[in-house]
Amino acid sequence: MRVALGIEYDGSQYFGWQRQAEVDTVQERLEKALSIVANEPIAVQCAGRTDAGVHATGQVVHFETNAVRKDTAWTLGVNVNLPDNIAVRWVKVVDDEFHARFTATARRYRYMIYNHQLRPGILRSGVSHYPGVIDEAKMHQAAQYLLGEQDFTSFRAVQCQSNTPFRCVHEVNVSRQGMYICVDIKANAFLHHMVRNIVGSLLEVGLGNQPIEWIEQLLALKDRNKAAATAKPNGLYLVDVTYPESYQLPKLSLGPLFMLD
């Protein structure tokens, strides 16, 4: 039997999603909890492998099991065995054609900026603090150069293992609510550090250090060294993964949910 789960987690205390030797990861914690409930070893496949410090409100995983359990066992039962900063949000039995990564048609990330001269206390691990005067309207305008299928070499991590630098950005929006600026970007898939590298360069535009057209120029240059530094990890959230409607997976609010001014 193949089971899909929706997962939410605060990634600030983990060395990323993917299981690694001798460090704490989200995948390891989830697999341990699932294995307890299933009473057999469980290995999961995820839609997107988030880096250290990165969060998710809309991660999707699937796994194979011989265990027959009620839905509440895969939600409430697994959550009892998870740390407080990881939670199962929904469960659905799926057919064998479903794959959390390979049947996904799009991923969506939100990057949350706390724009204030003084750093936050309560939300310090859930937002990235950037002081100074940031013009989110200019960031939004510059971000429109990213739309469509393009070569994103300038926004690709040096250690990225993808066979191609081409990705298709479906939509990107930059908006402000009070002290919070949200960079919301959806694409068919993302390169390693692609969102954080894009945000780092958009911030240079928003801070007035570069013109709006700089993003277009960076795309044409195809040179990671010409773009800005990678933005901090703690403001980044995987908020949604899109699948064909035929799978009828549950849909929840995207998040992250903050009390905004």
Swiss-Prot record:
Gene3D superfamilies: Pseudouridine synthase I, catalytic domain, C-terminal subdomain, Pseudouridine synthase I, catalytic domain, N-terminal subdomain
tRNA processing in keyword set: yes
Gene Ontology biological-process entries: tRNA pseudouridine synthesis
A GO MF label: RNA binding
Annotated substrate binding sites: 109
Transmembrane segments: none
Keywords associated with the record: Isomerase, tRNA processing
EC number: 5.4.99.12
Name of the protein in question: tRNA pseudouridine synthase A
Function according to Swiss-Prot or TrEMBL: Formation of pseudouridine at positions 38, 39 and 40 in the anticodon stem and loop of transfer RNAs.
InterPro entries: PsdUridine_synth_cat_dom_sf (IPR020103), PsdUridine_synth_TruA (IPR001406), PsdUridine_synth_TruA_a/b_dom (IPR020097), PsdUridine_synth_TruA_C (IPR020095), TruA/RsuA/RluB/E/F_N (IPR020094)
CDD domains named among the record's database cross-references: PseudoU_synth_EcTruA
Source organism (scientific name): Shewanella halifaxensis (strain HAW-EB4)
One Pfam family here: PseudoU_synth_1
Family: Belongs to the tRNA pseudouridine synthase TruA family.
Keyword rRNA processing attached: no
Active site positions, chain numbering: 51
Assembly and interaction partners: Homodimer.
Catalytic activity as recorded in UniProt: uridine(38/39/40) in tRNA = pseudouridine(38/39/40) in tRNA
Lineage: Bacteria, Pseudomonadati, Pseudomonadota, Gammaproteobacteria, Alteromonadales
